[in-house]
Each structure stands twice: as structure tokens, then as C-alpha cells.
UniProtKB/Swiss-Prot annotation:
Residues 165-250 form the PPIase FKBP-type domain. The keyword Repeat does not apply. The lineage of its organism: Bacteria, Pseudomonadati, Campylobacterota, Epsilonproteobacteria, Campylobacterales. Its main location: cytoplasm. Consists of 3 domains; the N-terminus binds the ribosome, the middle domain has PPIase activity, while the C-terminus has intrinsic chaperone activity on its own. This is Trigger factor. Keywords: Cell cycle, Cell division, Chaperone, Cytoplasm, Isomerase, Rotamase. It is found in: Cytoplasm. It catalyses: [protein]-peptidylproline (omega=180) = [protein]-peptidylproline (omega=0).
Amino acid sequence: MNLEVKKIDTANARLSAKPSVEDLEKRYDKIAQKIAQKVKIDGFRRGKVPLSLVKTRYQAQIDQDAQEEMIQEVLKNAFKELGIENKDLIGSPNLTKFEKKDAHFEIEADIGLKPTIVLDKIKECVPSVGVEIPNEEKINERLKQLAKDYAKFVDTDAQRKAQNDDKLTIDFEGFIDNAPFEGGKAENFTLILGNKQMLEDFEKALLGMQASEEKEFPLTFPSGYHAEHLAGKEALFKVKLHQIQAREALEINDELAKIVLANEENATLKLLKERVKGQLFLENKARLYNEELKEKLIENLDEKILFDLPKTIIEQEMDLLFRNALYSMQAEEVKSLQESQEKAKEKRESFRNDATKSVKITFIIDALAKEEKIGVHDNEVFQTLYYEAMMTGQNPESLIEQYRKNNMLAAVKMAMIEDRVLAYLLDKNLPKEQQEILEKMRPNAQKTQAG
């Protein structure tokens, strides 16, 4: 066999081979014998089918198996010559040429190797970090909100008129063209006025009503209403108000602290203020990281951490980005790409820079996660998806199964690891005073052993 291998750089190699047609044909009998042991053909006992008949009936399968066997032998010899093992590979080799000539085949393939990444410039990549420390005014604002959130609703006198932040219990029924419509009726329905639980015009119509009062009012559903059969329609609603409850004001003192910090043995207002300050600090930190610093850190990692990237993985990422882009394209654009191979190739090529950066950052994050022992457990992935489902009104089990079927769980896990690694690097660069605040709020760091 004529075999040539070339190591292009630390992450890429290429092979060129010319195995003979005779070499392929020598494999036919062995493969045909294996098939003959398994197949059953009328008139013959299992294992006694003539090879000539097997070769005729299963010619395509034999040819395919023989070619695959030959390619694997070519790769095995190439790996040996390169001095590499399967553990050194990243992804599968990409067969770029397989052509049959008169007496031989021409085979070419690109081989991706795990890159060598040196992390000695990480500190240079991390931008300076300074999170805003909450002042007394911000702390007091949050305390007032907590006092409101934890306040109980109590009954009001019969003369009270409904106002924003009151809790109402109502019956209602809606009609379109004098006929009730699906989803337009409820009894003993509760809502808090001003929370935008219902359409704004619906809640406005309830303002000023008194307990036991009944009211009719027109309402036009917005043109973009989520229930398409109601969008833009004019309706008439009949409402009966049963009960008005108002929040019982809570004072900002030790008693409030005991309610909010129910699991604390000695909760005081002083402790509550410390917790509020810490929580506001975490919120400020998350906002700064997500809106500014994480992207800046990624740009620095891309620019300053230099190493060879496996071409095969970049090509795979380009394919993925191209396929994902197709889903958001207009039908005429997709049709244009289908009709022109040149346009499709050009469109795919437009994703090269993004694909290269994505692959590079993934390798860097993976290396950092291993070095710092930062990981994400599978149950954390499921918790994240469960939360996503609850926030979007989806069935959690169905969403998780959808991710599993589409092989997307690994991508979610990697995204979570990336987020955790970036936050870890930025946290290390916080001023000492702010690191102390962070430690008080996070006694159990998010850094976990992968597994």
C-alpha cells in the first residue's frame, strides 16, 4: 500500500493512500463467509449457502464492508506512522477523497488531534472587576419591597373601593357576538390589581369597584394576543366582585427579619440588612458579568491564548451553525441556497470565523475547567431545564426529553460549565473587600468536582 502522512501542525494531520483494488477483492471472501454464517436462504441450511450465491445477493453490502475495512486499515497504518493513538484524536477523521481508479483507490483524509493548550496568560486575559456595592438607599428600597411581599392580605370593610395592590376575588364571563367563548369564564378567581395578571384594560375596569358589586364593560383583545382566536376581537365582560383584601403593612424591624429569615435562629434587622446587601451585590455582579465582563473576557481569551485548532472540528461547527441558520431564514432564501451550490457554499463559509472562535473558546474552557476542577453535575442540568420549562409554561419532562432526543444535554452542560468558569475567573479578580462580601453570601462555592 502506498501511504503518505503529513503532520501539518500540533492539531492537524493529513494522509494520502493508494491501496490496490486487489487488496479490496482479497477481503471479499472473508466478509462473504461471515455473512453466509448468518443469513438464511431457501433451499440451503444455515451456514451452507454457497459463497458465490452470497456474493451475488449481498454484493453491495460486501463491497461496502470491504471498503470500510480497508479504510480502517489505512487509518491504523497512518496513526502508527504518525506515532499517535485513538486517545490523541479529536472527533473522527474526515474522509475528503475516495476514488476508484483502474488498479487502485485514491484515499485522502484529514485527522484532527487534541490541541496542546498553555494557560500561562490567563491572568492577562481577566479584565479588572469592580462591582457596585449597594448603598443604604438601595438596601432600604429592598427592605420596603420585602415588607410588602411578606405582608398578609386581610379583609377590608364593605365600603372600600378596589385599588392597585388589592387582592380581589371575582367571577367573570366574556362574550363575543353575544356568545360565550372558550377560556372566557371563571369563578372565585383571584388576582392582585396592578400585577398585570390580566389584560390592562380588564384590570382598569375593576378599579373603584366594591364588594358584591356587578359590572359589565367592553374590552378589545390586542391584535397580537396569544390566543389567536381572540386576537383583535371585541368582547363584553360581566364581572361580580366578591371580596377585596388589602395588604397588612409590616414594619421594618426584627419581626420582619424573623419572617424573611425563618430558618435563622437569631434573625435580626441587622442580619437582614447584611443579607439584603449581599443579595443586591450578587445581583449587581451578575448584571455586570453578563452585560459586559464575560464577553470582554472571552474576547481576551480568543486573542491571547494561542494554539493550533483541529480543522475537522471547525468544519463540523460550521456545518452546525449553517444548519441552525437555515431554520431562521425566509423560505425564498432557503430555496435560493438549494438551487445554487455556489451560494450554499458561500453562505456556509461565512460562518468560519464564528465557528473558529467557538471551537477555540470551548477548548480553553474545557482546559480551565479541568485545571480548576470546575464541573456541573447532571442533576444541575436537569434543574436548569426544569426551571426553563416552568418559566416558559412548558412540561418539564417533555422539555428534558426533547433535549435528550436532540442530543442537546451535553451542549447545555458545556454552556453551564463555561458560565461557571468565566464567573470563577472574574471572581478571583474582585477587590479583597468584595471577595469578602461574596464569601459571606456563598459559603458553599459553586466550584464542584465534575462527575
